[in-house]
């Protein structure tokens, strides 16, 4: 059975749905194109949860009737009623779970593409190799989901690691799945650079940002400082005789981005701007969240960049996600992009936390 707070919220949403239907049938609303469009959008957003709630109430009514038939003196009728009770109980469980998911406020960024940024942290060359392992893991996961991965900017090391790599991941549900990956990832293993066979701990930081439509962020030309320089390769040597690499500084925030992977200055500038827009949107949203958190005194799923979220332990073939105390002994599978088990568990936890807020708000 759904909790009273959920039923109360569903009743309110259903009432809102009915009122919207009434509004949309009024001649004055039909004639007002903008208002009609706005109300139609609201109605569409509530349609699925309204239909689910109707199915839930219908199943609840049928279950009550089937339970009454269990008292019948007719043996055949009782057997049929028992089957119906079992079927309806299962159906109601499924509908309850679906309704809970729909009660959680939607993240407007869930439908967006992703700007993925991985930076090597503590651990020198080994940290850079780990950053490359993480990038490969996300590439494999994207491949499995049918998403497209394009490198926007990268800084490779001599051994094939990454000091930093930034990529655009395009595809349905990319942000809704990958947003849980932001934070510090830690690896424990014997590095290829280690001759004595000792286990080292290294880190890499992952940031997952929604791709931003440039119309969402207003930047004045005078707020940008654009510099060009010659692109350099893994060993630091120059790989280009002309200044094709681009560095852009957003003066008000101090955010700096650079790109040198493309052959032309124009292409590098376009890619750098794409990264900058995503970082600025993230910067402003985080500031807004901090203000809300101060008022609310609590914050759901902060995804702090400095938070250690996961450990990859090679000697034990173990992956531990510290946010939900989930441990899996299938490290190689995870590194091959089998991330759904972890992401599903994180998503379930987020829904649970947000439902607690729904309960409080009633």
UniProtKB/Swiss-Prot annotation:
State the Pfam families in the record. PCRF, RF-1
Please tell me the species this chain comes from: Aquifex aeolicus (strain VF5)
Q: Does the keyword Ribonucleoprotein apply?
A: no
Summarize the PTM comment.
Methylated by PrmC. Methylation increases the termination efficiency of RF1.
Question: Quick one: which gene encodes this?
Answer: prfA
Print the keywords alphabetically: Cytoplasm, Methylation, Protein biosynthesis
Family per record = Belongs to the prokaryotic/mitochondrial release factor family.
Under the heading HAMAP family, the entry gives: Rel_fac_1
- Give the sites modified to N5-methylglutamine: 237
A single GO molecular-function term is: translation release factor activity, codon specific
Q: What is this protein called?
A: Peptide chain release factor 1
* Cellular localization per UniProt: Cytoplasm
Q: Name one GO cellular component term.
A: cytoplasm
Role description: Peptide chain release factor 1 directs the termination of translation in response to the peptide chain termination codons UAG and UAA.
InterPro entries from the xrefs?
PCRF, Pep_chain_release_fac_I, Pep_chain_release_fac_I_sf, Prokaryotic/Mito_RF, RF-1
């Amino acid at each position: 059975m759904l909790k009273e707070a959920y039923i109360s919220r569903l009743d309110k949403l259903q009432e809102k749905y009915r009122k919207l239907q009434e509004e949309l049938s009024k001649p004055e609303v039909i004639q007002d194109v903008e208002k009609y469009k706005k109300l139609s959008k609201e109605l569409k957003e509530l349609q699925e949860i309204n239909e689910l709630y109707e199915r839930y109430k219908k199943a609840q009514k049928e279950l009550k009737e089937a339970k009454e038939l269990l008292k019948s003196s007719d043996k055949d009728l009782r057997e049929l009623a028992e089957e119906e009770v079992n079927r309806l109980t299962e159906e109601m469980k499924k509908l309850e779970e679906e309704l809970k998911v729909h009660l959680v406020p939607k993240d407007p960024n869930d439908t967006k593409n992703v700007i993925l940024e991985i930076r090597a942290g503590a651990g020198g060359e080994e940290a850079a190799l780990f950053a490359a392992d993480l990038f490969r893991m996300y590439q494999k996961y994207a491949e499995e989901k049918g998403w497209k991965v394009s490198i926007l900017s990268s800084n490779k090391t001599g051994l094939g690691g990454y000091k930093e790599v930034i990529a655009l991941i395009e595809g349905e549900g990319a942000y809704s799945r990958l947003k849980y990956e932001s934070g510090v990832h830690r690896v424990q293993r014997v590095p290829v650079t280690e001759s004595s066979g000792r286990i080292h701990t290294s880190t890499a930081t992952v940031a997952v940002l929604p791709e931003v439509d440039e119309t969402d962020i207003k930047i004045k030309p005078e707020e940008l400082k654009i510099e060009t320089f010659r692109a350099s390769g893994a060993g630091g040597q120059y790989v280009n005789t002309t200044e094709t690499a681009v560095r852009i500084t957003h003066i008000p925030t101090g955010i700096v981005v650079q790109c040198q992977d493309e052959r032309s200055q124009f292409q590098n500038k376009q890619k750098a701007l794409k990264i900058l827009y995503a970082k600025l949107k993230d910067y402003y949203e985080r500031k807004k969240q901090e203000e809300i958190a101060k008022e609310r005194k609590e914050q759901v799923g902060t995804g702090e960049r400095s938070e250690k979220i996961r450990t990859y332990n090679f000697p034990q073939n173990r992956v531990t996600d510290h946010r939900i105390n989930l441990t899996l002994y299938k490290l190689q599978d995870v590194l091959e992009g089998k991330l759904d088990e972890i992401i599903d568990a994180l998503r379930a936890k987020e829904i649970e936390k947000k439902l607690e807020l729904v309960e409080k708000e009633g």
